[in-house]
UniProtKB/Swiss-Prot annotation:
Residues 551-807 form the Protein kinase domain. PANTHER family: PROTEIN KINASE C, MU (PTHR22968), SERINE_THREONINE-PROTEIN KINASE D2 (PTHR22968:SF12). It comes from Homo sapiens. Residues 1-12, 236-245 have a biased composition (Low complexity). It comes from the Eukaryota. The modification Phosphotyrosine is found at residues 87, 407, 438, 717. The active site is at residue 674. The modification Phosphoserine is found at residues 30, 197-198, 200, 203, 206, 212, 214, 244, 518, 706, 710, 876. The gene is PRKD2. Keywords: Adaptive immunity, Angiogenesis, ATP-binding, Cell adhesion, Cell membrane, Cytoplasm, Golgi apparatus, Immunity, Kinase, Magnesium, Membrane, Metal-binding, Nucleotide-binding, Nucleus, Phosphoprotein, Repeat, Serine/threonine-protein kinase, Transferase, Zinc, Zinc-finger. One of its GO terms (biological process) is positive regulation of endothelial cell chemotaxis. ATP binds at residues 557-565, 580. Changing residue 87 to F: Loss of phosphorylation. No effect on the interaction with PRKCD. No effect on Ser-706 or/and Ser-710 phosphorylation. This is Serine/threonine-protein kinase D2. Changing residue 710 to A: Abolishes phosphorylation. Loss of Tyr-717 phosphorylation and any other tyrosine phosphorylation, and increases NF-kappa-B activation in response to oxidative stress.
Amino acid sequence: MATAPSYPAGLPGSPGPGSPPPPGGLELQSPPPLLPQIPAPGSGVSFHIQIGLTREFVLLPAASELAHVKQLACSIVDQKFPECGFYGLYDKILLFKHDPTSANLLQLVRSSGDIQEGDLVEVVLSASATFEDFQIRPHALTVHSYRAPAFCDHCGEMLFGLVRQGLKCDGCGLNYHKRCAFSIPNNCSGARKRRLSSTSLASGHSVRLGTSESLPCTAEELSRSTTELLPRRPPSSSSSSSASSYTGRPIELDKMLLSKVKVPHTFLIHSYTRPTVCQACKKLLKGLFRQGLQCKDCKFNCHKRCATRVPNDCLGEALINGDVPMEEATDFSEADKSALMDESEDSGVIPGSHSENALHASEEEEGEGGKAQSSLGYIPLMRVVQSVRHTTRKSSTTLREGWVVHYSNKDTLRKRHYWRLDCKCITLFQNNTTNRYYKEIPLSEILTVESAQNFSLVPPGTNPHCFEIVTANATYFVGEMPGGTPGGPSGQGAEAARGWETAIRQALMPVILQDAPSAPGHAPHRQASLSISVSNSQIQENVDIATVYQIFPDEVLGSGQFGVVYGGKHRKTGRDVAVKVIDKLRFPTKQESQLRNEVAILQSLRHPGIVNLECMFETPEKVFVVMEKLHGDMLEMILSSEKGRLPERLTKFLITQILVALRHLHFKNIVHCDLKPENVLLASADPFPQVKLCDFGFARIIGEKSFRRSVVGTPAYLAPEVLLNQGYNRSLDMWSVGVIMYVSLSGTFPFNEDEDINDQIQNAAFMYPASPWSHISAGAIDLINNLLQVKMRKRYSVDKSLSHPWLQEYQTWLDLRELEGKMGERYITHESDDARWEQFAAEHPLPGSGLPTDRDLGGACPPQDHDMQGLAERISVL
């Protein structure tokens, strides 16, 4: 009896030990001879591909290479055995030709020329395929609209929305949030495709021949029939999907994670604010609060009863970072992009949480040990809850559009254009379908909108206009009163003109005033009639804020509990401003006193290092505080830096400016009381910018030897005496400077809130771990130690800090002198230091000796050129 052939391992249909005999009692023997089919001349070679117990008849085009045969084999695996496919299958298979005349039944196919007409080619899995290869199977994700409630199979939360709520895998049928696609492991089971695929053959005798219902196909036809091949094909594959398709995290990341040690989950009782299912049993977590358990590291959710059945496969917090870009298999529409971004932004992550703001500040060269050590007891630098994140909406909303006739005092020819009014300007288009426009009238340049008054420029033989738009450079006469005949062309008529006049007036008003309700039983008063209670500018009393400033409601610079900060413009000068709009109806008396305290303090201050207050407007419902608009804050600079921390040179530059501004405040007996990186604003996008202090809501008037006891400020930056409700003085600000300096150089907060601050300060190993403090100078650590003194009498003052050797450096002096040259004012350095630094430059061969002018900052930075270059690019993006 003939010897049974050895079946390839790892593919379906291969008989194993104890397998039942084939039906009918037939023994497995060598495949019987196949009846060759005669192809058309020049059409190619027809042969059979066998995978396990399945055979498919294929036609290989003439002059094809071995790569085509491998593609055909991969296509059959994807069609018949989707659960057995994996990433890189193309490179992990071998082709053997059955040769009954040879002692070795299977002959390795080395080229397409080895395959002859009617041959049987066996597909065998190579020994180079590892266990990890079988575990990595990318998902084929497409945007899907669900008709019934569905839950994400990654995070367990419900997929919200009416349409296009999430992503569905075409292979396994699992559902995911769009935001979760960044973290989905490549573990597609292919169960959905397996249900749709054909069954394998029962024995080797039932061979699919070239019938109409079978698969006699060419390489092109077989490739077209498989739509899921894209993530598994070599670069030569041309198959694509018509639908938007996405994949999860990169394959290389999965390979790295498979080699990591998996640890048990750390479950904590959690209260869920949205419907969530248990990721172990796939059942809903029921209840109003404390519904289940959540792993504090990987955010795995489960029932309390299911926690014991959850495997020890926690991969830690590093996976939930959202830093892996989602690859796109095909192009997708702008609507899909916006929907994806909206879903990502509305991810339910609490602002300031570790999952959103965790910084990876450790250098790669310090190794895994340094990273683990630096992350044990430290809180990463983050934006605290009281802070405001600067954001700008993508586009303005169209308030009104339509055809309008108009002329001006500079051109009396009456024209007709398609006007479009948004929150920032009036655009005059040639027609309603083109993007080409005739003119733009920014709302910030409109001084007044008046009823028709000047009829001296009305073109002869035409009707008078309806209203006038007055700017500093021109006056526009808009609309046309109807003549003797009713109706008329579009853009004419008193009714249309009144609609445009009302819309423009409303656009010129602050957005908050347009919907302010009037008190019951009272006639609605004119909300635009405002009075200025405090002013530092040449503006008369009892004027309308809309006549002085244009507030852009779509440019939100920040928001808080009681109001919103909008961008704006001064109408006459075009100067950018920031307008803090506060709702007095939601404003407690205590916070209102803080606001008035801030305004009163800022009114008395005039210093280049302190934000400038222009004026304050007030109505019965609202308060408008107008200040100069700056570029960003110091926290954004730290978070956007390459290593999550600032170089020493830049930190010296910024800390010196902060100390100079504090010296001016303390000279006037003003203590800021809420100093933190969020309240240190950048005046420009320069790599070495001017900084200004802002947010004086907690500021206090404290004499040189006076003390206060009221609770103020942000706890993360507050001195111990405030947290312990003890008396404090102006040295409170110096503690905050020490914390700012610490977080700037390290990217982490110096203290753990669960332990005593005094004990932490005395533990040098805890305060200054090797990563990253081994790369920071001893002078910086010494200054921080003198600022973070629990005893107030030992804490450095402003003048003592400015005289510290770490800040008294020639390079820092050069940087500050260049800034003063740009500002045209000397307020940081002093003339008495010039001779000392000139002598120092003569004795030490340092670049840039003498008074600096315009020079390249990067060229004068010996140790940290690469840091400053990367930081300059990020600051320009802010």
